[in-house]
Design a protein with these regions (language model features):
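Non-catalytic cap/lid and distal C-terminal segments of serine-dependent acyl enzymes
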Residues: 18-27, 31-65, 70-395
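Positively charged n-region of N-terminal signal peptides that target proteins for export
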Residues: 1-5
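Hydrophobic h-region of N-terminal signal peptides that target proteins for export
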Residues: 9-17
Length: 395
């Protein structure tokens, strides 16, 4: 008991010291992990145990890459300069080997599992858990004849879905970006909390949100190996186009029928939307504009128009996407919302491409929304803001 009492006193002293310094454990930490910690200025403290290592380097993907300092107790520590608010991926380089920090949950990004830390945005609560009614996120598997395989998706069901059993709901299909997967919008993007908070504030209608695995190839289809191919090369574009076409068919022929037969959906086109970030935005444009009989709300978050954005040419409304933009009044009758978004700090190629697409749509007299997230890069903080602006405009 004496040892327990001493431990409690030490723990209380440690907590007081942490509060005085302003550092608090990150919301991304595993249970019981004291580090990483974040302070109100956005600085991050990392502390990892590697007593036999000779060099440990902190590797933030969109932030500092710095050597850590070894302490006498075998722990390595570092405090970063202030980071911009939002979610940050990072890894550790221990004696040349890249590993995750076991103190945080794992997040899939950049085609691998990585660690992550959340730097709060002062005054913003729209993407954090609040004392409001919460929906549920369910995990589903569906069999796709397009790919000849079982495929995985996460489905957000709004609050009261299980109690108000006579109600039916519109559906938003929400896609991740390249290098990430169907878990990204929940794990990194906090889409469920964003929807919970918007619905509680009566800022958007209750809806079902489907987040599907975004990579697809047909049964027997051999895609070109993208590894090492120059970005924008004919080989890479061919493989991307093949994969996008396969994903389009999977969504329209397998996923939508599965969702409509499994959940209480409003299954007409006026109650179906699709949006996606980066690669998911490009997939959204291809899928929806080729199937306006199925979709009436379209959103591209830092990605829309495919190579119209990544290339250097303007939209040709007469020919692009089978000429759907050639008749603005007819397009407006079918599409209730066309929405584009980009962060003002995104790479020049992305910003310029989306600005060019926006200007082309203006010249073609196509009604649309062009949202710019101030000060954010090609990152989850941009896409959280995108969803916050996009969702209230639906249905």
């Amino acid at each position: 008991m004496k040892h327990v009492g001493i431990a409690i006193i030490l723990f209380a002293s440690l907590c007081c010291a942490q509060e005085a310094g302003g550092f608090q454990p990150s919301s991304t930490n595993v249970w019981g992990a004291e580090y990483p910690q974040v302070d109100s200025a956005g600085r991050v403290q990392i502390r990892v145990k590697a007593p036999d290592a000779t060099k440990v380097r902190l590797n933030f993907w969109s932030g500092p890459k710095v050597d850590m300092e070894k302490q006498q107790d075998g722990y390595w520590t570092v405090t970063t300069p202030p980071l911009v608010p939002g979610f940050h991926y990072y890894t550790l380089i221990i004696d040349g080997m890249e590993v995750s920090d076991l103190n945080t949950h794992a997040f899939f990004g950049g085609t691998k599992e990585a660690s992550g830390v959340e730097v709060p945005e002062p005054g913003s609560t729209y993407y954090s858990i609040q004392d409001v009614p919460h929906g549920q996120v369910r995990e589903v598997w569906y069999n796709s004849k397009v790919t000849g395989s079982w495929r995985h998706a996460l489905v957000y069901l709004p609050p009261n879905y299980d109690t108000q059993t006579k109600d039916r709901y519109p559906v938003l299909y929400l896609q991740h970006g390249a290098g990430e997967d169907e878990t990204g919008w929940i794990r990194q993007g906090n889409a469920n909390f964003i929807l919970d908070n918007l619905i509680a504030a009566k800022s958007c209608k209750p809806m079902i949100v489907v987040m599907a695995y975004g990579y697809a190839k047909r049964a027997g289809q051999n895609l070109s190996d993208l590894t090492g191919k120059p970005f924008g090369s004919p080989e890479m574009l061919k493989a991307m186009q093949e994969m996008a076409a396969s994903f389009e068919d999977d969504v329209t022929q397998a996923l939508i029928p599965y969702i409509d037969s499994t959940f209480r959906t409003l299954s007409d086109r006026d109650h179906r939307a699709m949006a996606g970030l980066s690669m998911g935005g490009m997939q959204t444009f291809q899928t929806t504009l080729n199937h306006l009989d199925l979709f009436s709300y379209i959103g591209g978050f830092s990605g829309a128009g495919g190579m119209l954005v990544l290339g250097d040419r303007k939209l040709d409304p007469r020919t692009d996407y089978n000429g759907v933009f050639a008749d603005p009044p007819a397009f407006a009758k079918k599409v209730h919302l066309l929405w584009l978004g980009v962060g003002t700090a995104e790479p020049e190629r992305m910003r310029a491409g989306l600005q060019r697409l926006h200007n082309s749509l203006l010249e073609a007299n196509i009604e649309h929304v062009f949202y710019q997230s101030p000060g954010t890069d090609h990152e989850w903080q941009t896409w959280r803001r995108d969803l916050k602006d996009f969702a209230p405009r639906l249905f």
